């Protein structure tokens, strides 16, 4: 009988121990899974790719515009010469849009119309450099950057190329056309004395004025002529 009473007690102790183990096992494994959770204070670096998606990456390059980079708080624009390792410095600008426009002018000059531009819609408004020298390209790039210069209100300036002297030529032509519309013929032909001069040149007296019958003169001279012819 004593053996039968001891056996159930042993089984209960074993089951109790197994329950305790089953309860304590999850708590032992929980610290191992915590480093992989989202609340970890030190995640693994992703190789720099998230930094590339920002406005400026680790190297200072812009994520949208080509040929510019951030350096000391300003945007530097530069372009590599074709088939060379040298670069042409195009200037330093306060906003990225100005530096991007400067790059576009240089890209068109060095790579032609097939160049990839930051502002393709403004390609026809850019003034091409005089030559492909670094100085001429830099000067043309500076003019293009001024077109993207923001004013005090934050809006960009839109500058249209104006040909020097064009307005003066238009005004001069309009004034000449106005002067030709009015011509003083009497002053040019001297109309008051024209007929008299013609008569003197032909040795003829000017024609007499016709007198209306009702305005005939009743002077004796006129009646004398009538009286002479009235006698037979």
From Swiss-Prot:
GO terms for molecular function: DNA-binding transcription factor activity; transcription cis-regulatory region binding. Residues 64-120 bind DNA. InterPro entries: AP2/ERF_dom, AP2/ERF_dom_sf, DNA-bd_dom_sf, DRE1A-I. The keyword Transcription applies. Its main location: nucleus. Residues 1-63, 213-232 are annotated as: Disordered. SMART domains: AP2. Residues 1-29 have a biased composition (Polar residues). Coiled coil: none annotated. It is found in: Nucleus. Keywords: Activator, DNA-binding, Ethylene signaling pathway, Nucleus, Transcription, Transcription regulation. It holds the Pfam family AP2. PROSITE patterns: AP2_ERF. It comes from the Eukaryota. Signal peptide: none annotated. SUPFAM superfamilies: DNA-binding domain. Residues 30-50 have a biased composition (Low complexity). One of its GO terms (biological process) is glucosinolate metabolic process. GO terms for cellular component: nucleus. Probably acts as a transcriptional activator. Binds to the GCC-box pathogenesis-related promoter element. May be involved in the regulation of gene expression by stress factors and by components of stress signal transduction pathways. Belongs to the AP2/ERF transcription factor family. ERF subfamily. This is Ethylene-responsive transcription factor ERF025. It comes from Arabidopsis thaliana.
């Amino acid at each position: 009988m004593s053996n039968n009473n001891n056996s159930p007690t042993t089984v209960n102790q074993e089951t109790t121990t197994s329950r305790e183990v089953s309860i304590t096992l999850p708590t032992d494994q929980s610290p191992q899974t915590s480093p992989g959770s989202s609340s970890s204070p030190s995640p693994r670096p992703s190789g720099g790719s998230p930094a590339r998606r920002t406005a400026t990456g680790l190297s200072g390059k812009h994520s949208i515009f080509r040929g510019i980079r951030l350096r000391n708080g300003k945007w530097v624009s530069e372009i590599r010469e074709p088939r060379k390792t040298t670069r042409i410095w195009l200037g330093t600008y306060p906003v990225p849009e100005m530096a991007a426009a400067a790059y576009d002018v240089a890209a068109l000059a060095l790579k032609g119309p097939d160049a990839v531009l930051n502002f393709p819609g403004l390609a026809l408004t850019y003034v091409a450099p005089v030559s492909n020298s670094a100085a001429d390209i830099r000067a043309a790039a500076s003019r293009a950057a001024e077109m993207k210069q923001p004013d005090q209100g934050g809006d960009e300036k839109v500058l249209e190329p104006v040909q020097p002297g064009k307005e003066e030529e238009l005004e001069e032509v309009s004034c000449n056309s106005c002067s030709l519309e009015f011509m003083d013929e009497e002053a040019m032909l001297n109309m008051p004395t024209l007929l008299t001069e013609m008569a003197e040149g032909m040795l003829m007296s000017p024609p007499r004025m016709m007198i209306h019958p009702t305005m005939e003169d009743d002077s004796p001279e006129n009646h004398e002529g009538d009286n002479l012819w009235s006698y037979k």
